[in-house]
């Protein structure tokens, strides 16, 4: 009977438990989010599949993680799973049977992983799988049983892999397959047996492979022709004559095999031994092979793996679980820092595990679970800092354990209790703290003397360096905070160390007086009192820090600058019973500030700026006993303000300016009744109640008469005078603001600051926590910072369009996780750094158009990002580089975003303006948030770029070492003292010293600097060519190749040996000059003969025997007629016309783009092209604000024109005014825009860049438009009957100035070449595409050049300089003329001068007073620096050194006295002057001189010729007596 009862009870319990299991909800894995039957774990950086996935899960998202391995247990039990997303991980291994429980699986995505192979029969249990994506992996082969069991697959994607082998029958079971992608692989051959069982196949991609089109692939051509819609673009890659041919177009006879070839069915078996390793006798040896990960798919029978001395960093889950017979595993001397908890799972035979010499810091829980046979465990030379108490619980047979040389400070009691067979243990070289928690280890080692390495204590100091096994146990004791920090070490929990800048004593953490502005991140959990007083806190943020401090009881925030406490700031502080907020800057108190303080008993709010206590200020603080509001600015307390404080026993309201009007009437009676208030709070207003205790005022005296109706608790908000406020919306638009106005309500949700003068995002915006919209458009903001939008967690809309933004810092938008709309339209942004939008997870719309985006590889991420969910509407276009110009960010393929060489410096300088070196003349550049950059100029220069000299000599105008001197009495003038050998206004002329030279024997004089050189004839030498040479002397004989040298009157001649010619017999005579080589043979010269090198096919001594005749090939361009000046070039053996700018077509026969450079030009299209129902589309680019694009009609007309940069379309049917529509977009940015015009009988539609069309409908009367009139493009003729358009309001009637291309009328591309071409209309769109001429007309001068024809009153290359310069003929004496306007100027005086015209001298310090010149005199340089000008024969800074004797060439007049007349040579004469000193008592003087005749002119008008002695050589000689 009892047995039956127990059975019944067991059955009942089982039934109840079964029901509970089905009803009770299962927990969601940590970090993941669960909704219904969907589990979302994407993008969490997971390294393995999380455990505890609910059994009822139908959809599991694991994409975007770091998972490397899929094991058999990862998805065990998930029998309801239908969708599994595993793309974008690092999966390299999938164990066989990993999907065996997924009976309901329908869709599986494994694309973008690292799979190289996958086991056969992997999908055996997934009978309902119909979509499988394995693309973008590294799969090399498809084995025969790869998809066995997955018979319902309809969509199979294998593209972008490395597949080179597909075994026969691999797809045989996939009879329902509809989509198969094999493109972009390495496939060379295929068997027909692989594809002849797919009757439903509708999409098949095989292009971009290495197909070898020989006889074995002939079946594929017929197969593709029978299915013309599949296998498109499949091409042969070999043999060479078929390369690039479509397989379906190759005839069957062309599929030939050379020689004897037999086709073997491919076998895709993969070697189990890795290529880098050796395998023998069940041992896999991979030592020192540079491996970075554990090799996979090893033989399952191996018993030993040697992986030491590699670079492995991670041991993934189940890395060795397939190898059940493994006995020895060596992983020493790697870089292992991460071990999966189940890394060694299932290795029951393992008896040796070597892990020394790695970077392991912690042993995961259950790491050694189940290793019952382990005898040797080496963990030495790692960085292990803790051991869990159960780390070795299954190691009953362990003999040796080495933990030598790690970072262990303590070991929990019981850690080694399971090691029943332990014989040797190494614990030395660990920094053990020998406190009370390590006492057990000393006792253990006394009882079991197995520690042989000599483990010692590191601290405390009294036990330092003593052996643990030799210390008495009573000396192991705890003091201070040691007990708190290490008492949980058995769970690998050691509490945090004392924070930097703080002091810890017992359970008190003191961080006061440290100028902190936020709470330290790492506070020990044992903290009971936290002191943060006397710091720089302004806002207490909700960081969740108090959730980590379960023991906290008291917090001190006194003497800070706190103005606000965020909601949730104290969340988790449920145990805190005392908070001190004394001496801060709080202005109001709200209950949400103290949310989470359920146990608070004391709240100190003394000495703040609180003006009102509301009736909801202290809701939720029912435990507070003491509340101090002493010394605030409280004037009003709302009725019921203290009703929620049920435990309140002490209330301090003293030292507050209470206004005892009708709003405070309730408080007097409340104070009398409660009797919990400290002292007697007194009235301060009205005057007749001043200093009267509130509780003593009669109820009838609390009145609001005489205008005393102030109530600080009134909900009315303030509004700045510059703004308008409605509820929580504040509008401050178009007010010229440069700073944020004061008085904006704290609860503002929408703030409009557009149309102002802000240059930076106001820092004060971070104080407004409730903002959901900020509009800062149309300001002058040039820079953003990483903190521009901090603390704006609720922001939904941020508008920054039409500013001067050039650069987006990487973390500008961090924290804006709620943002939905971001507008950066109309700025100067070229690059957005990758990761800048990482936190914008809720963003649905990004406006970034009208920016010069530089779309290289660094912007590929942004293109992918906007494409992912169409977050950008297709407006943003690229400005470069190269072919990316004008491409849409949204639709351009990602592969087009490539980097070709270094990025242009102008692009890089947008985020670092100083990179472009804008500061001239060695100025120092500093980045500036408003002006982009600022230059600190060196002495002598000024201006924004330091490019303006302060006076004329600063720029060193005197060349070749000349000295600059400022002129007196002239504006900015200077004069130069030239160095010897130079003359001219700027010392730019090198004097011709050869004009009077002494070169002899017909030698040639070569001018130098203040000297000359004589270039001698071959037979002479010497300084003046005065010595004759013997050329046939042994050391000078120039004759080569044993030829004979013979002296001649003019020099020498060489008598050459046979076979050589030339002046020096140095040329081997070319015997090929008169050769008999035939048929284009190459003649090779030899000594006294030659050899004929025959072309291919020719033979004979002179190549006279010809080969069989072959027909010469002709160039493909010979009969290919390129038009309009185009050049024919050959690409891939095909002729192609390279068109000139503006032309298009196979032979460049059409002109499709023209440039309107003359504002009186237009094109005329015949009327037959335009009917009542017409669609006109064209692309335009211009910088102009106005101009006519299209015009048709007479009095009644259709006109499309530019009006203030927008497109205006008007339809005048005779009514006044004409009907008109305008585009939303402005298009005068220089970029191309698409304009589309659609006319119907009663409507006109205008669309720009594919945007929403603007329409004119329901016209006032039937149109009388003359459709027989022509259509004018780019302008119109100046006839009287179109004057109405020119005079219409807002219209200027001027012709278009810019570029028009791709004009379509009713889908027909128009050829401008067929229209009359006026002057001022040029083919193509460059170089006058941009508005380069400021006040004039651009005229192209070549394909890439241009000239500007200036308007009246302007001049310069770009017509940007006015012709009337007021500084012409100015009267500034010692200064610079500065124009004030077109008619007047002012003088900026040089240093030392003053007055209106800088004509008055001022006292000036003479720098020459500080310098002494021994043999010379002091001069001032052009920049005002003193220097010594030395006398002849002396040098040095002070002219104190005598130079050695040398001849200094001077150029001067010779002078003579003839009676009373002074005479001099008619020109300057060059001569030597001997200067310097000599040693040994000798004198410097002439060694050689000449006499030369010169003409002289005298002061009395006479002239004569006389000889003059000239010195030609100087040196040291005996002094003259």
UniProtKB/Swiss-Prot annotation:
InterPro entries according to UniProt: ConA-like_dom_sf, Cys-rich_flank_reg_C, Cys_knot_C, EGF-like_Ca-bd_dom, EGF-like_CS, EGF-like_dom, EGF-type_Asp/Asn_hydroxyl_site, EGF_Ca-bd_CS
Glycosylated residues, chain numbering: 66, 186, 556, 615, 786, 791, 1001-1002, 1011, 1175, 1258, 1292
Compartments it resides in: Secreted
Residue intervals of the CTCK domain: 1445-1520
Positions of the EGF-like domain: 912-947, 949-988, 990-1026, 1028-1066, 1068-1104, 1113-1149, 1329-1360, 1363-1399, 1404-1440
Keywords: Chemotaxis, Developmental protein, Differentiation, Disulfide bond, EGF-like domain, Glycoprotein, Heparin-binding, Leucine-rich repeat, Neurogenesis, Repeat, Secreted, Signal
Residues at the site labelled Cleavage: 1113-1114
CDD domains: EGF_CA (cd00054), LamG (cd00110)
GO biological process, one term: negative regulation of cell population proliferation
Molecular function in Gene Ontology: calcium ion binding; chemorepellent activity; heparin binding; signaling receptor binding
Pfam family membership, one: hEGF
GO CC field: collagen-containing extracellular matrix; extracellular space; plasma membrane
Domain called Laminin G-like: residue spans: 1152-1325
Main location: secreted
Free-text disruption phenotype from the record: Mice show significant axon guidance errors in a variety of pathways, including corticofugal, callosal and thalamocortical tracts. Mice double-deficient in SLIT1 and SLIT2 show retinal axon guidance defects and a disorganized lateral olfactory tract (LOT).
Repeat positions for LRR: 56-77, 80-101, 104-125, 128-149, 152-173, 176-197, 301-322, 325-346, 349-370, 373-394, 397-418, 526-547, 551-572, 575-596, 599-620, 623-644, 747-769, 770-791, 794-815, 818-839
Disulfide bonds: 277-286, 434-457, 436-478, 498-504, 502-511, 660-683, 662-704, 719-725, 723-732, 855-878, 857-899, 914-925, 919-935, 937-946, 953-964, 958-976, 978-987, 994-1005, 999-1014, 1016-1025, 1032-1045, 1039-1054, 1056-1065, 1072-1083, 1077-1092, 1094-1103, 1117-1128, 1122-1137, 1139-1148, 1299-1325, 1333-1338, 1350-1359, 1367-1377, 1372-1387, 1389-1398, 1408-1418, 1413-1428, 1430-1439, 1445-1484, 1463-1498, 1474-1514, 1478-1516
Tissues and organs where the protein is expressed, per its UniProt entry: Expressed in developing eye, in the optic stalk, and in the ventral diencephalon.
Subunit annotation: Homodimer. Interacts with GREM1. Binds ROBO1 and ROBO2 with high affinity.
Entry function: Thought to act as molecular guidance cue in cellular migration, and function appears to be mediated by interaction with roundabout homolog receptors. During neural development involved in axonal navigation at the ventral midline of the neural tube and projection of axons to different regions. SLIT1 and SLIT2 seem to be essential for midline guidance in the forebrain by acting as repulsive signal preventing inappropriate midline crossing by axons projecting from the olfactory bulb.
Domain notes: The leucine-rich repeat domain is sufficient for guiding both axon projection and neuronal migration, in vitro.
Protein name: Slit homolog 2 protein
Gene: Slit2
């Amino acid at each position: 009977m009892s047995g039956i009862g127990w059975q019944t009870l067991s059955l009942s319990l089982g039934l109840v438990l079964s029901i509970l299991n089905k009803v009770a909800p299962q927990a969601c894995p940590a970090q993941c989010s669960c909704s219904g039957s969907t589990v979302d774990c994407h993008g969490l950086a997971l390294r393995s599949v999380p455990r505890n996935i609910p059994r009822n899960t139908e959809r599991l998202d694991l994409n975007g993680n770091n998972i490397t391995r899929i094991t058999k247990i990862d998805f065990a039990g998930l029998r309801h799973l239908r969708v599994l997303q595993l793309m974008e991980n690092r999966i390299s291994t999938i164990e066989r049977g990993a999907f065996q429980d997924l009976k309901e699986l329908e869709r599986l995505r494994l694309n973008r992983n690292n799979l190289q192979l996958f086991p056969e029969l992997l999908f055996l249990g997934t009978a309902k799988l119909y979509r499988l994506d394995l693309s973008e992996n590294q799969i090399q082969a498809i084995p025969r049983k790869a998809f066995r069991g997955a018979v319902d697959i309809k969509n199979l994607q294998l593209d972008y892999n490395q597949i080179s082998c597909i075994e026969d029958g691999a797809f045989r079971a996939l009879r329902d397959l509809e989509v198969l992608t094999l493109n972009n692989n390495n496939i060379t051959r295929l068997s027909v047996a692989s594809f002849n069982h797919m009757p439903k196949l509708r999409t098949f991609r095989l292009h971009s492979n290495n197909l070898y089109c020989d006889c074995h692939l002939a079946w594929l051509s017929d197969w593709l022709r029978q299915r013309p819609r599949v296998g498109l673009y499949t091409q042969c890659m070999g043999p060479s004559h078929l390369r690039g041919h479509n397989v379906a177009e190759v005839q069957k006879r062309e599929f030939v095999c050379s020689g004897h070839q037999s086709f073997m069915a491919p076998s895709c078996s993969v070697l189990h031994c890795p290529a880098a390793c050796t395998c023998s006798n069940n041992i896999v040896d991979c030592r020192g092979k540079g491996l970075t990960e554990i090799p996979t798919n090893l033989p399952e029978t191996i018993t030993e793996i040697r992986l030491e001395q590699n670079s492995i960093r991670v041991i993934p889950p189940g890395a060795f679980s397939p190898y059940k017979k493994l006995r020895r595993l060596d992983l020493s001397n790697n870089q292992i820092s991460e071990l999966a908890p189940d890394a060694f799972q299932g290795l029951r035979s393992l008896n040796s595990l070597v892990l020394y010499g790695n970077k392991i810091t912690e042993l995961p829980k259950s790491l050694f679970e189940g290793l019952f046979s382990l005898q040797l465990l080496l963990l030495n030379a790692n960085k292990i800092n803790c051991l869990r108490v159960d780390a070795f619980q299954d190691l009953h047979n362990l003999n040796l354990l080495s933990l030598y040389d790690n970072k262990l400070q303590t070991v929990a009691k019981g850690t080694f209790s399971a090691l029943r067979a332990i014989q040797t243990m190494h614990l030395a070289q660990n920094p053990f703290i020998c406190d009370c928690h390590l006492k057990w280890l000393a006792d253990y080692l006394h009882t079991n003397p197995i520690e042989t390495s000599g483990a010692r204590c590191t601290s405390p100091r009294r036990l330092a360096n003593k052996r643990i096994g030799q210390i008495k146990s009573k000396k192991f004791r705890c003091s201070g905070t040691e007990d708190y920090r290490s008492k949980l070490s058995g769970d690998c929990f050691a509490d945090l160390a004392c924070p930097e800048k703080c002091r810890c004593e017992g359970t008190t953490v003191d961080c006061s007086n440290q100028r902190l502005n936020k709470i330290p991140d790492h506070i020990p959990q044992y903290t009971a009192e936290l002191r943060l007083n006397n710091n720089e806190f302004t806002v207490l943020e909700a960081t969740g820090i108090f959730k980590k401090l379960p023991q906290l009881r008291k917090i001190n925030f006194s003497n800070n600058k706190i103005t606000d406490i965020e909601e949730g700031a104290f969340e988790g502080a449920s145990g805190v019973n005392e908070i001190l907020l004394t001496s801060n800057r709080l202005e109001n108190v709200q209950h949400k500030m103290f949310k989470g303080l359920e146990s608070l008993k004391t709240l100190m709010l003394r000495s703040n700026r609180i003006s009102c206590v509301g009736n909801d200020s202290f809701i939720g603080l029912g435990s507070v006993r003491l509340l101090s509001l002493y010394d605030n600015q409280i004037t009003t307390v709302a009725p019921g303000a203290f009703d929620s404080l049920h435990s309140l026993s002490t209330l301090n309201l003293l030292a507050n300016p209470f206004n005892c009007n009708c709003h405070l009437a309730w408080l007097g009676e409340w104070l009398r009744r409660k009797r919990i208030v400290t002292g007697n709070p007194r009235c301060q207003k009205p005057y007749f109640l001043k200093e009267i205790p509130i509780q003593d005022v009669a109820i009838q005296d609390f009145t609001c008469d005489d205008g005393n109706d102030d109530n600080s608790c009134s909900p009315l908000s303030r509004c700045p005078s510059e703004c308008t406020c409605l509820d929580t919306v504040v509008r401050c638009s178009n007010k010229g603001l440069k700073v944020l106005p004061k008085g904006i309500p704290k609860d503002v949700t929408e703030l409009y600051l557009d149309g102002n003068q802000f240059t930076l995002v106001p820092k004060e915006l971070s104080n407004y926590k409730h903002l959901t919209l900020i509009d800062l458009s149309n300001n002058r903001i040039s820079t953003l910072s990483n903190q521009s939008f901090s603390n704006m967690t609720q922001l939904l809309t941020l508008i920054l369009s039409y500013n001067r933004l050039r650069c987006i810092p990487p973390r500008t938008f961090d924290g804006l996780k709620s943002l939905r709309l971001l507008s950066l339209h109309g700025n100067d942004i070229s690059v957005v750094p990758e990761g800048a939008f990482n936190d914008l997870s809720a963003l649905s719309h990004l406006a970034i158009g009208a920016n010069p985006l530089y779309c290289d590889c660094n912007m590929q991420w942004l293109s992918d990002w906007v494409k992912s969910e169409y977050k950008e509407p297709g407006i943003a276009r690229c400005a470069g580089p190269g072919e990316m110009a004008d491409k849409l960010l949204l639709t351009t393929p990602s592969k087009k975003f490539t980097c070709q060489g270094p990025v242009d410096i102008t692009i890089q300088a947008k985020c670092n303006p100083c990179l472009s070196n804008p500061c001239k003349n060695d100025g120092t550049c500093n980045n500036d948030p408003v002006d982009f950059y600022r230059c600190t100029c060196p002495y002598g220069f000024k201006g924004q770029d330091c490019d303006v000299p302060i006076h004329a000599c600063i720029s060193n105008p005197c060349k070749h070492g000349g000295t600059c001197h400022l002129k007196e009495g002239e504006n900015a003038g200077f004069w130069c003292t030239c160095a010897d050998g130079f003359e001219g206004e700027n010392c730019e002329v090198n004097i011709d010293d050869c004009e009077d030279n002494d070169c002899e024997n017909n030698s040639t004089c070569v001018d130098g600097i203040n000297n000359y050189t004589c270039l001698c004839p071959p037979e002479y030498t010497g300084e003046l060519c005065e010595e004759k040479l013997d050329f046939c002397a042994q050391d000078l004989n120039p004759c080569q190749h044993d030829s004979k040298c013979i002296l001649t009157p003019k020099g020498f001649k060489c008598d050459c040996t046979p076979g050589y010619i030339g002046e020096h017999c140095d040329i081997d005579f070319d015997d090929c000059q008169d050769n008999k080589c035939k048929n284009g043979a190459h003649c090779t010269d030899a000594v006294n003969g030659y050899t004929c090198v025959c072309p291919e096919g020719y033979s004979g001594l002179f190549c006279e025997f010809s080969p069989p005749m072959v027909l010469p090939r002709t160039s493909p361009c010979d009969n290919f007629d390129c038009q309009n000046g185009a050049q024919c070039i050959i690409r891939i053996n095909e002729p192609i016309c390279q068109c000139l700018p503006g032309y298009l077509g196979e032979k460049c026969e059409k002109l499709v783009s023209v440039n309107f450079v003359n504002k009186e030009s237009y094109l005329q299209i015949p009327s037959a092209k335009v009917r009542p129902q017409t669609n006109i589309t064209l692309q335009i680019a211009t910088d102009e604000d106005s101009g006519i694009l299209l015009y048709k009609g007479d009095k009644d007309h259709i006109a499309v024109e530019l009006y203030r940069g927008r497109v205006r379309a008007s339809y005048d049917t005779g009514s006044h005014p004409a009907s008109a529509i305008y585009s939303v977009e402005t298009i005068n940015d220089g970029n191309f825009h698409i304009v589309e015009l659609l006319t119907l009988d009663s409507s006109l539609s205008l669309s720009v860049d594919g945007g929403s069309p603007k329409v004119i409908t329901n016209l006032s009367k039937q149109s009388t438009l003359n459709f027989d009139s022509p259509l004018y493009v780019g302008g119109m003729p100046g006839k009287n009957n179109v004057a109405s358009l020119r005079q219409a309001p807002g219209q200027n009637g001027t012709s278009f100035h810019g570029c028009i291309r791709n004009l379509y009328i009713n889908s027909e591309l128009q050829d401008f070449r067929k229209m009359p071409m006026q002057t001022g209309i040029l083919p193509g769109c460059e170089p006058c595409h941009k508005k380069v001429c400021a006040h004039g007309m651009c005229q192209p001068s070549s394909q890439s050049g241009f000239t500007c024809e200036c308007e009246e009153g302007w001049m310069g290359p770009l017509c940007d300089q006015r012709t009337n310069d007021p500084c012409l003929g100015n009267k500034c004496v010692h200064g610079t003329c500065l124009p004030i306007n077109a008619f007047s100027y002012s003088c900026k005086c040089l240093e030392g001068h003053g007055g209106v015209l800088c004509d008055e001298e001022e006292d000036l310090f003479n720098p020459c007073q500080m310098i002494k010149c021994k043999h010379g005199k002091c001069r001032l340089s052009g920049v005002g620096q003193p220097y010594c000008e030395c006398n002849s024969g002396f040098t040095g800074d002070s002219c104190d050194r005598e130079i050695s004797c040398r001849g200094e060439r001077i150029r001067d007049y010779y002078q003579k006295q003839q009676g009373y007349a002074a005479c001099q040579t008619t020109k300057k004469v060059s001569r030597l002057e001997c200067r310097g000193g000599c040693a040994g008592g000798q004198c410097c003087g002439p060694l050689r001189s000449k006499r030369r005749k010169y003409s002289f002119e005298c002061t009395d008008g006479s002239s004569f010729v006389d000889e003059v002695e000239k010195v030609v050589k100087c040196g040291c000689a005996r002094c003259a007596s």
